[in-house]
Structure formats: C-alpha cells, structure tokens
C-alpha cells in the first residue's frame, strides 16, 4: 500500500465541511453530482501499481473485505449528514464508479449493496451510468449478470496487453484469451464494456503493441482507455529499473505507440474524446467527464478524494485507520483545501485542453492574474498577450488552425503528445 498522503488541513470537529463546499459553479449554476467508491483490495499487487491498494483482505474488524460494505455505509451516511449541514442540495448521483484495487474481489452482491447505499444516501438518477472496474480473471458470467441485474450499466476490464510476455512484466495474472470471453459475458448481461490498456512496458516492441491493438479492435468494446506506463518511485517496478533489471520506457517509443493507438482505434470507429480515451459515439465515460467538467463528487473508501464546491477533500489512506475513524463517528477525511479562483481557472484550462472540445480562447483571460484581465473585451476575444502564443502553437502544429478560427484551442494529434507544453504556453 502506498504510504504517501496529501498534505492539507484536517476538518474540524467530527468532520464539518467549510462553507465553500456549497459554492455554485463559476457561472452560477448547480453542479451535477457523482460518487466514487474505492475498494482497496487486490489478490495480487502489480509491480507498477502505486494506487492505494492492499493484498491483505483480513485487516481486522471494519477494515476487512467482508466488513467493507458495512463500514462504507457509515461513511456515506456521514457524508450525507455533513453535506446537509452546509446547505448542499440533495442531488441524485448522475454517475457512480467503483474503482480500486480490484472491486470484483468482493462478491457481486456486495457491489450491488454498495450501489443501494448510494441510492439511499444521495439518490440515483434514472439514467445513471454505474461502472465497476474488474480484472478479467476476477469475474464470471453469473457475477456479471448479477451486477447488471443489480443496477450496474458498465464494466471496465483491465486488459493492459494481449501479449503474454508483456502481461508477465506487468505482473498481470490473467491469460490473454480470457479478455474476449469476459467481454462477451458482459455484453450478454447487457453491460457496456471498456478495456484499459498500458503501453510502454519494458520489453514491449512496436509489434507487440500492434498485436494488442489488433486484439482490441477485433473484440470491439464500446470504450478504450490507453495510458503510457509511468514508473512511480517506490513501486516494485521502479526498484527493478533502478537495479538495471528492466529498462526505463523511452519517450519516443511511447509517442509512436500513442499514434498507433489513435490510428487503429479511429479506423475501428472509436473517436478520441480525451487524450487517453476513445469511444464509440455515445459511449463516452460520463464519470470521467465529471472530473474534467468540474462536477461535484463524493469519494468514499480509503484514500478516496472528493470535490464539493470550492473544496477538495481526501480520506485517510490505510483501511484500518479509515475504518477506525468511521467507527467513532468521524468523517474519515485526512485533509482538505479550499480552491481559490486562480487555481480553479488553471485547472479548468489544464483539464479542458485535454478534451476533444478544447477550451474557448476568449475564456483564457478569465484568470485573476491574467496580464490583460482588465481589458474591455474580456471574455469575448482572445487575450491580446496570447494572440502571438496561439499563432505560434498553430505554426508548430500543436493547435488545430480551423478550431482557432472558430475561437477554440483544440489539440492536434501532435498537440496531444505535448499537452503539458500547450497548457504552459496558454497559462503564462
């Protein structure tokens, strides 16, 4: 389990929220609401993983896998109480995402019970998107059918690769042939399907990656996520690289593999809607969009993060400490921060530029520290100090020229590979 914990002020008392948690969106509208549920358990911890997970499923009363639903109920009910206390309106969850860890380590009945808790505490929209993550070898046909019957609409499988030696390096436990089987089971149950891929694993050739892409397009899921491998300090893979047992991924190799993914998925009918995500039209992950579009969400479970109004919160990471706080009636929040206007605008630009819709050029002058913030046409035209910057980004092939003429900053394929560079240029 990763020991790192964000630094921030704890909440006062038993977990009272600051008044800024009830802040409306910058345009004055009420934010939609989502729920994230973090299940921290895994049968095996992958060598590259730095998520808040544990292979110990029996950590004591309240923190063990068999007690998880009961402890989660305590957090969700406390969350509803503190949200009421600052005047946050009751809003039915538009999306629910169960992540981990490996949520499907728990029985399907437990996951359905968790969804019922969300319905009890917040309500659930009639057309809510309800997703669980799953490993291909952690589900069976009956379990997927039970999830669909219990209200889940979507399952995201951690495929990562279709090549055995790559899966071995990543320390994944499933066989490649398992993936099309579980996708077929999910479809029969009426669930929408997503496959997660990782590219850039040590020893993965371009031919290996193409083989994985060919298998994905053959299976034909509704949604695909593809992420470059990041070797985080402190992980087992980081130690292997440091000792020279595995090579460090190369940036040029990862860029080529991203371009290969975009070409293969586009040819198969999947459209990119965020740098790392492609989907059939209408199958975009709405829960992901909640993060990118500044919705409110409550994150429950060890180490989960929440966002309410102008406040970010994060839970205690260790399941034993998390469960102990809930048992004593405390909201298990380890820290929080209040987001100021400048930080919110920077985040809006940073996240928005990653989307297919990009960001409105005129809105780039809305930051309080913008050099031309006091100009008369603020909000209606590209800030004057950014006009040459935008022209330069178009000239470098990073922004779409046609989109700029329509008043929007939208990344080209090359720009997607250099999104951080574009963001820095637009926020200087």
Label every PLM stretch briefly.
Residues 374-395:
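Short amphipathic alpha-helical interaction segments
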């Amino acid at each position: 389990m990763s020991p790192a914990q964000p630094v921030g002020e704890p909440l006062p008392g038993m977990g009272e929220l600051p008044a800024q948690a009830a802040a409306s969106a910058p345009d004055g509208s009420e934010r939609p609401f989502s729920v994230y549920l973090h299940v921290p358990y895994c049968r095996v911890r992958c060598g590259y993983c730095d998520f808040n997970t544990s292979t110990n499923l029996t950590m004591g009363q309240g923190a063990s896998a068999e007690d998880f639903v009961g402890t989660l109920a305590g957090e969700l009910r406390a969350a509803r109480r503190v949200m009421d206390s600052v005047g946050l309106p009751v809003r039915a969850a538009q999306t629910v995402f169960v992540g981990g860890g490996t949520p499907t380590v728990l029985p399907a009945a437990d996951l359905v019970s968790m969804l019922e808790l969300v319905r009890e505490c917040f309500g659930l929209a009639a057309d809510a998107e309800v997703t669980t993550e799953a490993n291909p070898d952690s589900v069976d046909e009956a379990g997927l059918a039970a999830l669909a019957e219990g209200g889940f609409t979507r399952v995201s499988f951690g495929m990562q690769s279709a090549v055995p030696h790559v899966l071995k390096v990543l320390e994944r436990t499933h066989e490649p042939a398992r993936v099309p089987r579980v996708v077929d089971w999910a479809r029969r149950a009426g669930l929408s399907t997503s496959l997660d891929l990782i590219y850039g694993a040590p020893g993965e050739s371009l031919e290996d990656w193409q083989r994985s892409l060919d298998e994905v397009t053959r299976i034909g899921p509704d949604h695909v996520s593809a992420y470059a491998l990041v070797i985080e300090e402190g992980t087992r893979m980081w130690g292997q690289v440091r000792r020279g047992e595995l090579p460090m991924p190369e940036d040029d190799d990862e860029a080529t593999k991203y371009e290969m993914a975009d070409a293969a998925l586009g040819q198969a009918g999947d459209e990119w809607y965020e740098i790392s995500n492609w989907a059939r039209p209408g199958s975009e992950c709405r829960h992901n969009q909640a993060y990118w579009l500044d919705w409110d969400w409550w994150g429950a479970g060890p180490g989960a993060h929440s966002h309410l109004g102008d406040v970010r919160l994060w839970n205690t990471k260790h399941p034993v400490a998390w469960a102990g706080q809930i048992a004593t009636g405390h909201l298990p929040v380890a820290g929080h921060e209040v987001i100021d206007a400048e930080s919110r605008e920077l985040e809006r630009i940073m996240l928005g530029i990653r989307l297919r819709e990009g960001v409105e050029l005129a809105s780039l002058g809305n930051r309080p520290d913008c050099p031309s913030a006091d100009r008369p046409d603020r909000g209606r035209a590209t800030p004057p100090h950014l006009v040459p910057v935008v022209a330069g980004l178009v000239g470098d092939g990073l922004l779409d020229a046609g989109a700029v003429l329509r008043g929007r900053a939208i990344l080209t394929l090359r720009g997607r590979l250099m999104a951080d560079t574009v963001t820095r240029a637009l926020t200087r």
